[in-house]
Swiss-Prot record:
Record keywords: Cell inner membrane, Cell membrane, Hydrolase, Membrane, Metal-binding, Metalloprotease, Protease, Transmembrane, Transmembrane helix, Zinc
Disulfide bonds: none
Family: Belongs to the peptidase M48B family.
Identification of the protein by name: Protease HtpX
Gene label: htpX
Length: 290
């Protein structure tokens, strides 16, 4: 689950920065905010830009954020097994060998990240390696390799880009309507204060619409989890995948944050399933059992 939350947080930060830049460009270039086509074009450029910048930074940020130690040369039997298992699964899935790494954490989790299928990273926590059986860990690795093979990060990026575009677009449309409604005159002072109020309103609306839009992203994320589970069942075996999920259900709630969350094996619980990046484990097991 680590991967998606880090992605979303990075994307949000980039969106906020680009949103400020967008407002400045409107003023400098004299673009009419009421021009729907021009506004939509700019929002699309910056909306998709934020997503793709997050995507390109995803592997670098994952390594830095979680202290992932990439295995260059296996130093022990566990690392040998880890690298050889991922290599075998990558061949079977038809992708290039991902980088393989370990990060220090007591929780049982793993994630995959990377901008392309053939330039990816699969990382596992030390807690997973020492708490799971080899069969269970093999299924977890297969789940992450399936995320890479399915191109899930690129898919999420495209979805997030569309969501970003419409969040930015409708925030500015609604802010413009509100600003016009409360404008009583066009004197210089009113114009100056009105511009500031418009920017604040846009910021607040982007936050509000962003929360609502995240439900769309999370829904797609949950569908990709079911697909990754099915892929893992093919690569490692259905019984191993079910056993791994059952083992995860008995463990502590993961503490992953950021974009890593969606592409980890396990996700955080939420008051509402609408905001969960992963389906409940019992649903995932039921789907595997058919």
């Amino acid at each position: 689950m680590k991967r998606i939350m880090l992605f979303l947080v990075t994307n949000l930060a980039v969106m906020l920065v680009l949103g400020v830049v967008l407002n400045i460009l409107f003023s400098v270039l004299g673009i009419n905010k009421s021009s729907i086509s021009g506004l939509l074009m700019f929002c699309a450029v910056f909306g998709f830009g934020g997503s793709f910048i997050s995507l390109l930074m995803s592997k670098w940020m994952a390594k830095r954020s979680y202290g992932v130690q990439v295995i260059e040369q296996p130093r022990n039997e566990t690392e040998h097994w880890l690298v050889s298992t991922v290599a075998r699964q990558a061949r079977e899935a038809g992708i290039k060998m991902p980088e393989v790494g370990i990060y220090d954490s007591p929780e049982m989790n793993a994630f995959a990240t990377g901008a392309r299928r053939d330039d990816s990273l699969v990382a596992v926590s030390s807690g997973l390696l020492y708490s799971m059986s080899r069969d269970e860990a093999e299924a977890v690795l297969a789940h992450e390799v399936s995320h890479v093979a399915n191109g899930d990060m690129v898919t999420l990026t495209l979805i997030q880009g569309v969501v970003n575009t419409f969040v930015m677009f409708f925030a500015r449309i609604v802010a413009g309507v509100i600003s016009n409604f409360f404008s009583s005159n066009n004197d210089e002072e009113s114009s100056s204060s009105g511009g500031f109020a418009y920017m604040i309103t846009v910021f607040v609306l982007e936050m509000a619409f962003g929360v609502l839009a995240s439900m769309i992203v999370m829904w797609f994320s949950r569908q990709r989890e079911f697909r990754a589970d099915a892929g893992a069942a093919k690569l490692a075996g259905r019984d191993k995948m079910i056993a791994a999920l059952q083992r995860l259900s008995r463990g502590a709630e993961p503490q992953m944050e950021g974009s890593m969350m969606a592409f980890g094996i396990n996700g955080k619980r939420s008051m509402s399933e609408l905001f969960m990046s992963h389906p409940p484990i019992e649903q995932r097991i039921a789907a595997l059992r058919g």
